[in-house]
């Protein structure tokens, strides 16, 4: 998690920092083969050089960016979780629970779906 230390230290709100660290640590522990990176000032996880999932912090939520194909794949689960979303990101409100089952579903979908992907983003 050293890669994310500076990013986390820059999150002013202690609760937001703790929640973000909790999510990033959960992913790192659950998927130890994924690489941790900071790109575009966002913590993200990659696999063989291809993007798997990324995050950003805002005043009202933790934004999750798994790529739009993945959001379409899990759209029903996003609705069931009660999260607001666009075609590119999902908003997990700070005052609500993190649906780790949904995160797992998105990460596993991307790992499998992008197994043969040779680019950072899907084409």
From Swiss-Prot:
Cofactor(s) listed: Fe(2+)
Signal peptide residues on this chain, from the entry's feature table: none
Molecular function as annotated in GO: metal ion binding
InterPro entries linked to this entry: YdhG-like (IPR014922)
Presence of the UniProt keyword Nucleotide-binding in the record: no
Cofactor comment text: Binds 1.0 Fe(2+) to 1.5 to 3.2 Fe(2+) per monomer.
Cellular component terms per the entry's GO annotation: cytoplasm
Disrupted-gene phenotype: Reduced growth in rich medium, unable to grow in minimal medium. Reduced activity of Fe-S-dependent aconitase (citB). Reactive oxygen species are drastically reduced. No bacillibactin (BB), an endogenous siderophore, produced. 20% higher intracellular iron concentrations.
An example Gene Ontology biological process: iron ion transport
Domain of life: Bacteria
Pfam families: DUF1801
Disulfide bonds: none
Assembly mode: Homodimer, upon Fe(2+) binding. Interacts with the SufS/SufU complex. Interacts with CpfC.
Protein name per the record: Intracellular iron chaperone frataxin
Organism for this UniProt entry: Bacillus subtilis (strain 168)
């Amino acid at each position: 998690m050293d890669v994310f230390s500076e990013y986390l230290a820059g999150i002013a709100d202690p609760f937001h920092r703790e929640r973000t660290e909790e999510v990033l640590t959960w992913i790192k522990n659950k998927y130890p083969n994924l690489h941790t990176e900071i790109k575009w000032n966002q913590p993200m996880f990659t696999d063989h050089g291809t993007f798997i999932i990324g995050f950003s912090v805002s005043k009202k939520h933790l934004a999750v960016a798994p790529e739009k194909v993945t959001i379409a794949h899990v759209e029903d689960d996003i609705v069931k979780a009660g999260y607001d979303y666009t075609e590119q990101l999902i908003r997990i409100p700070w005052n609500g629970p993190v649906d780790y089952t949904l995160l797992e579903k998105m990460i596993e979908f991307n790992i499998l779906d992008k197994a043969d992907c040779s680019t950072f983003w899907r084409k």
